[in-house]
Amino acid sequence: MINKPKIAVLCNNRMAVPALQSLHAEGRLCAVGVAEGNTDVIDFCSWLSQSGVPFFIIGKENRSLQIRKMVDTTAADYIFTMTFPWKISTELLHDYPDTFYNFHYGLLPEMRGADPVFESIRSRAKETGITVHAIDEAIDRGAMILKKNIPLTADMTHGSLCTRLSWLGAGLLHELIVLLQSKVKGTLQDEQHAQYFPKPGIADVCISWQKQDAETIEALARACNPWNKGVYTQWNGWNIRIVEATVVHGMASHPGLPGTILSLDKEQGFIVKCNHDTHLRLDIVCTDEGFMSGHKLSAFGLKKGGQLINL
């Protein structure tokens, strides 16, 4: 009879929560480690320590010693990393072979990087999913143990996709554990299809009206909602973030430059011309003054014929 394995989880994000709850309910969770400074996750996970699960706050500089202590004191069979922000050292990988596995919240090898959720939505991918892979010295390059795909719908935001993937991660645990106990080594990644996307920077979360069409901007707004409170544009030195938008079809061609405000009223909404003579209605925006319907920006001086510019 195969013994019930003991599993420790290293995490830094709410996406790990359903999996933590599932492992705890099944009596498999032997420890949790959370990156220091993440008060939201630390506060949530404190309930685990109250129920007897050892809880470790991991610092960046001494993480190898802390992780080693966690493994040794709990006799964990497997360590699952779920959005853990730092690499596992070569020494730990050598000393504890076939122990460390990463939950990558995107499809490998084509969606490597720090935020595959953002990139999947921004690129309007047709599907996404979770890839569980063995951790080795190279980031996101280990052998794939299990991959689960889901369709990526056109209304999915960064936040809603994170929630969907978090429950997908919890749902695949049983199958994953069976594979690991069967000593499955996984499938090597095809480097010919590999792509790496760095963590989104300021240029990635700003609109370029002259280069991007309406569908591109609409997808970018969803990719930035809610973590960045939308995608940036600017009017008269005032930063505006577009949280939710709708592509408008069937409008007549307009001679104005991309970024021109074509409508700003309650009836038609806040409509802006984009590249390739496409049109976008800015439904919800965020400013320092708060979240509001796009058309309400008329109270701040924006007018039809005005120009939104790149940040």
Language-model features, listed with the residues they occupy:
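One-carbon transfer enzymes
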Residues: 1-227, 232, 266-267, 274-281, ...
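C-terminal substrate-binding/catalytic lobe of Rossmann-fold NAD(P)-dependent oxidoreductases
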Residues: 224-273
